[in-house]
């Protein structure tokens, strides 16, 4: 009908490949951002939860440490 250039679908093929490459790029960026979010959450939990709980556990451990009895109390 009104065909100006016989390109045998090269333009359509190129446009489809650009869409595929754009989609792969978006998926890759999303994956990198997800990994970055995981590292950020881990850092936040490390500073907010893990370190204070570790310090409280250290205080609890030192509080619960029992001194051994002296030898004059124990009669063997």
Swiss-Prot record:
The gene is E. Belongs to the alphacoronaviruses E protein family. It is found in: Host Golgi apparatus membrane. This is Envelope small membrane protein. PROSITE patterns: COV_E. It is a single-pass type III membrane protein. Homopentamer. Interacts with membrane protein M in the budding compartment of the host cell, which is located between endoplasmic reticulum and the Golgi complex. Interacts with Nucleoprotein. GO terms for cellular component: host cell Golgi membrane; membrane. The chain crosses the membrane at residues 15-35. Plays a central role in virus morphogenesis and assembly. Acts as a viroporin and self-assembles in host membranes forming pentameric protein-lipid pores that allow ion transport. Also plays a role in the induction of apoptosis. It holds the Pfam family CoV_E. Its main location: host cell. Residues 36-76 are intravirion. InterPro entries: E_protein_aCoV, E_protein_CoV. GO terms for biological process: disruption of cellular anatomical structure in another organism; viral budding from Golgi membrane. Residues 1-14 are virion surface. It comes from Bat coronavirus 512/2005 (BtCoV). Keywords: Apoptosis, Host Golgi apparatus, Host membrane, Membrane, Transmembrane, Transmembrane helix. Bat coronavirus 512/2005 is highly similar to porcine epidemic diarrhea virus (PEDV).
């Amino acid at each position: 009908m009104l065909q100006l250039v016989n390109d045998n679908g090269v333009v359509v093929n190129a446009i489809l490949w650009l869409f595929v490459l754009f989609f792969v790029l978006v998926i890759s960026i999303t994956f990198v951002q997800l990994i970055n979010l995981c590292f950020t959450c881990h850092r936040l939990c490390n500073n907010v939860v893990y370190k204070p709980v570790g310090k409280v556990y250290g205080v609890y451990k030192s509080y619960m440490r029992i001194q051994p009895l002296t030898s004059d109390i124990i009669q063997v």
